[in-house]
Design a protein with these regions (language model features):
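C-terminal helical/coil "lid" or tail adjacent to the Rossmann-like core of SAM-dependent
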Residues: 213-246
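Conserved N-terminal segment of class I S-adenosyl-L-methionine
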Residues: 2-126, 130, 134, 144-147, ...
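Short, glycine-/aromatic-enriched active-site segment of Class I SAM-dependent methyltransferases
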Residues: 159-182
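Conserved S-adenosyl-L-methionine
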Residues: 198-209
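A short glycine-rich, Lys/Arg-flanked "PGG" loop and its adjoining helix->strand segment in the class I
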Residues: 144-157
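Residues lining the SAM
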Residues: 134-137, 160
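Short alpha-helix
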Residues: 181-197
Length: 270
């Protein structure tokens, strides 16, 4: 979570001998629930709602830009993002290598213009009109090779990653997320993307709405206050599930300092 401006995961009671498992609730009949592992975000897990809405906001922003297109959603995970894209795109193919995520997505998100394939993202092959590849480049070992494959498969790609400066502890090379091989600053992100594409336009994701108010409260000492009042868990147990995608906003580089962004969202063209 971004330091100084982030919503914390709710503080839990003393850790029991067996760590708590977070599993999706309320799944439709016949749809296997997924367990939260940290590799991907999930809907229907109240404690995960901040991260889910943070990802959902970007999918909604991209969906408005792929009207009528044939789209591949690489590393689609649970499938919710592919479903959002299918609201506007002519056809969406959600691709993920994880068998549990693939089975879940195929069972839960059913519509004529949406299908799911189980495969490695490195095997992407077009032609597509656009490729969506969100919050996964930091998991990839051979990034240049994958970006080359994406650039070959589609003339347009939306690629996002967290900002290391607001995710990792100050001065650290990366956060403690064990799935991340490398995290990027804005300069590092540009440097890895630009050789693969003709043009790269990067937007930053920032807090808005309730989260912007929360960030200001943190700056005024809210962390100390809720701790002193012993209301940390009750407050965040209510606040975190109330977060929505509208509590995030995307801004282009010319309108915001991307060093302060939560995530970078690159629009890459051939």
């Amino acid at each position: 979570m971004a330091r100084n401006c982030s919503v914390r995961r709710p503080v839990s009671p003393p850790v029991p001998e067996t760590p708590r498992r977070y599993v999706q609730s309320g799944q439709p009949e016949g749809v296997p629930a997924l367990e939260l592992t940290g590799e991907r975000t999930l809907p229907d897990v109240p404690e995960e709602n901040y991260w889910f809405r943070r990802h959902l906001a970007v999918y909604e922003w991209i969906a408005a830009r792929v009207d009528g297109m044939r789209v591949a959603d690489l590393a689609c995970g649970e499938g919710y993002g592919s479903d959002v894209l299918a609201d506007r795109a002519a056809e969406v193919v959600g691709i993920d290598a994880n068998p549990e995520a693939h089975d879940h997505a195929k069972a839960r998100y059913v519509r004529p213009n949406l299908r799911f394939e189980r495969d490695l993202v490195e095997n992407v092959a077009g032609p597509f009109d656009a490729i969506v590849f969100l919050q996964t480049i930091e998991h990839i070992e051979d990034v240049p090779a994958l970006l080359g494959a994406i650039a070959t498969a589609a003339p347009l790609a939306f690629i996002s990653t967290p900002n290391r400066l607001t995710l990792a502890p100050e001065g650290a090379e990366k956060s403690d997320n064990p799935w991340h091989l490398r995290e990027y600053t804005i300069a590092e992100y540009r440097a890895v993307l630009e050789p693969a594409f003709g043009s790269v336009e990067i937007h930053g994701l920032f807090h808005a709405g309730k989260l912007a108010v929360h960030a200001r409260a943190i700056g005024l000492g809210w962390d100390r206050i809720h701790s002193l009042l012993r209301i940390t868990k009750p407050f965040y147990d209510r606040f975190t599930p109330a977060i929505s995608a509208s509590d995030f906003v995307l801004r282009p580089a010319g309108e915001a300092d991307l060093d302060e962004a939560l995530d970078f969202v690159a629009v890459c063209r051939e």
